[in-house]
């Protein structure tokens, strides 16, 4: 009976931590860059683009393909930074909780 109570208490702790992490991640902002800083893409914790900055030197018709590639690269850079930040935050907030090896929280 005590084991069941302990498990329920731990489950509640995990649920509370998950909610706290999700709230904090919503406010997270990361900037991805490409082309040596010619393109900057800002994402929030929900992987929504909140800003794009493009150096005016890329705004030429003959540069459109390069521009498209750089925007994608900057987006992917920001997305990777968000994922790393989420993973680090989750690890720090769930330290000490009895989670199975390889357990991942669903935050997308």
Curated annotation (Swiss-Prot):
Transmembrane segments: none
Primary site of residence: cytoplasm
UniProt KW keywords: Cytoplasm, DNA-binding
Annotated localization: Cytoplasm, Nucleoid
Signal peptide: none
Single GO MF descriptor: DNA binding
Gene Ontology CC entries for this record: bacterial nucleoid; cytosol
Pfam families: YbaB_DNA_bd (PF02575)
Similarity comment text for this entry: Belongs to the YbaB/EbfC family.
Function recorded in the entry: Binds to DNA and alters its conformation. May be involved in regulation of gene expression, nucleoid organization and DNA protection.
Record's subunit section: Homodimer.
HAMAP family named among the record's database cross-references: DNA_YbaB_EbfC
Protein name per Swiss-Prot or TrEMBL: Nucleoid-associated protein BQ02190
Organism: Bartonella quintana (strain Toulouse) (Rochalimaea quintana)
Organismal lineage: Bacteria, Pseudomonadati, Pseudomonadota, Alphaproteobacteria, Hyphomicrobiales
């Amino acid at each position: 009976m005590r084991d069941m109570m302990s498990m329920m208490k731990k489950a509640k702790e995990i649920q509370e931590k998950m909610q706290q992490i999700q709230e904090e991640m919503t406010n997270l902002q990361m900037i991805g860059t490409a082309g040596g800083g010619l393109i900057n893409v800002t994402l929030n914790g929900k992987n929504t683009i909140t800003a794009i900055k493009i150096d005016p030197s890329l705004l030429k018709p003959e540069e459109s393909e390069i521009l498209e590639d750089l925007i994608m690269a900057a987006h992917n850079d920001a997305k990777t930074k968000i994922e790393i930040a989420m993973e680090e935050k989750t690890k720090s907030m769930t330290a000490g909780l009895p989670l199975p090896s390889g357990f991942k929280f669903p935050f997308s």
